[in-house]
Amino acid sequence: MIRLAACQYAIELHETWEAYADHLQGLCAEAVEAGARLLLLPEYAGLVLSGQLSAEQRGDLKASIVGIQPLIEPWKALCESLARRWGIYLQPGSIPVLDRDGRYRNRAWLFGPKGVLGYQDKLMMTRFEREQWDIAAGQGLQVFDTELGRLGILICYDNEFPMLARRLAEGGADLILAPSCTDTEAGYHRVRIGAQARALENQIAVLQSPTVGLAPWSPALDENIGRAGLFVPPDHGMPGDGVVALSEESSPATSQWLVCEVDLEEVRRVRREGQVFTRRDWPEQFERIV
């Protein structure tokens, strides 16, 4: 049994590095004290670093991501130090990163007790990212080997595309981390429904962490709504609706952790002994439509 913590992350203004570092450390300490071994924050949680920029720069959609680039390495070092100190796995949400080709990508690093395990870029861009923000798509999917099991990361919109999760499942992932950032109930439910569908199709677990709250100082994070949740395939020994845990409200005033547990061996058992074999039978559908 693994104890996980997914954050409903309230977007707050932290105008100095010290204030931000204290905030992140204190927030993570709450989950660690609750016994969590893996902590998940949402998509674009790293963009909160833009609070340290001038009001003019943080209020400009493109200037804000330019301005945070010098803060990314200190931010990574902070996240790594927290993971090492507490012996945990930390996925601190995603952050826009200037890549080697001069394009910005939405990147999610994973940190563990021994340091940086790697990163996953978002692959499918929303209309906002494509049309207004010029965030570029990443390439390729990573499966991370950890002491807890094999993990994959699908950032927000990526959860709405079945073949991405399928590739992670084929690579051995038992748990997908789904950091998300949505500004409407419809947006939140698109990601959640996608996450639950991916859990059903691949007979794996999916953990979702959303942004919440209002941040009028940030044009990218101004409105946020969503619930944290842990989803599994509905089957023998699993919840009938596939929902292991779900936040009570979608717009809390402050950041809240959803601390929950999953037995990945029980999830694997469903793949062997379940009422249905959606994972095994996946290829058969393509034989039926030719």
State each model region's role.
Residues 17-113, 183-197, 202:
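Cys-nucleophile CN-hydrolase/nitrilase-fold catalytic domain and related Cys-dependent amidase chemistry
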Residues 71, 75-91, 160-254:
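CN hydrolase (nitrilase-like) catalytic-core segments centered on the catalytic cysteine
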Residues 122-135, 254-269:
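A short, polar/charged loop-to-alpha-helix boundary motif
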Residues 257-290:
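A short C-terminal boundary segment appended to hydrolase-like catalytic domains
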Residues 1-6:
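Extreme N-terminal starter segment of soluble prokaryotic enzymes
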Residues 97-171, 184-197, 276, 282:
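Active-site catalytic loop in hydrolytic enzyme cores
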Residues 92-93, 106-110, 142, 208, ...:
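Short beta-strand scaffold segments in enzyme catalytic cores
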Residues 8-15:
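Short polar catalytic/cofactor-binding loops
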